[in-house]
């Protein structure tokens, strides 16, 4: 069964216990923003009971311990892997749902799409899967591993913890043509909202999950059109602060180079991203569009002015929604528990 937004009733008590309500009252508006008339927590808990917080308690009790240990080991030697894992889960969930289709690696898959060429973290997921197969063979899906690893990476970066439910199955198929569903760095807010709403997410989730750009880097190739000869003007995008545009031009002479998405606190999971947007220092055009659009600008302003903890709390809620988009469950014949994350079982040998 494909579920647009799946969860379990048992999580309700956990989420309600989060200190989110204190931050919610500071968010502008209600309808459409996740206020009293649009309670996100209610949409998280349909009565299907197909995923569970304790899914692996008996069949693989060390599941989360293995994930956290491996993420810590890998990010210790390469700190850029933390943001990379967050980006990887976004790209997985944003195509056909959180089904690990992005991990399949053969001709014609999402992973082989030109739009996926800068994705990273695959080797870490493979390492975790290899360890799982030693501890509890055939029990843990790659989709659940990626979901758990993205949270472990977020926490490792100083971000929030959120409760994950498990029991996802892995997709047997992956198609490069589907990658166009992932929001690109050049879409306007209307297009972004249409995409998010198709996932069962709302405008608050859009602004909050965009805040993941408080860490990580952007490929200069994705922003050079904003820096050089913008709209055939021979100059840069006028929506970028002039001094910041000059800085980016000096850092992005070659498409292969990278630049911090947050130039102020690039290694800290905080609300600086929103402060930067208020100062016209958004690296991606989609980031800066959030300040210009009246549907999103009030939220950007709120997260910029409130305590960073408000952003962290809401990020946890929005991530708990995102990682349950379009999952495959135990009743799905189209899903499986892969033996190797990069290959469907029919291709594993």
Swiss-Prot record:
Transmembrane parts of this sequence: none
Q: Which positions does UniProt annotate for substrate binding?
A: 183
Where mainly located?
Answer: secreted
Q: Which domain of life is it from?
A: Eukaryota
Cofactor annotation comment:
Binds 1 heme b (iron(II)-protoporphyrin IX) group per subunit. Binds 2 calcium ions per subunit.
Write out the residues that bind heme b.
213
Q: Which cofactor does it need?
A: heme b; Ca(2+)
Sample GO molecular function, one term: metal ion binding
Residues at which Ca(2+) 1 binds: 92, 95, 97, 99, 101
Q: What class of enzyme is it?
A: oxidoreductase
Example GO biological process: response to oxidative stress
Indicate which residues are glycosylated according to the record: 231
Q: InterPro entries, from UniProt?
A: Haem_peroxidase, Haem_peroxidase_sf, Peroxidase_pln, Peroxidases_AS, Peroxidases_heam-ligand_BS, Secretory_peroxidase
Q: Any keyword Iron?
A: yes
List cellular component terms (GO): extracellular region
Its UniProt entry gives the catalysed reaction(s) as: 2 a phenolic donor + H2O2 = 2 a phenolic radical donor + 2 H2O
Q: What does this protein do?
A: Removal of H(2)O(2), oxidation of toxic reductants, biosynthesis and degradation of lignin, suberization, auxin catabolism, response to environmental stresses such as wounding, pathogen attack and oxidative stress. These functions might be dependent on each isozyme/isoform in each plant tissue.
| UniProt miscellaneous comment | There are 73 peroxidase genes in A.thaliana.
Per its record, how is this protein called by name? Peroxidase 7
**What species does this protein belong to?**
Arabidopsis thaliana
Whichever gene encodes this chain, its name is: PER7
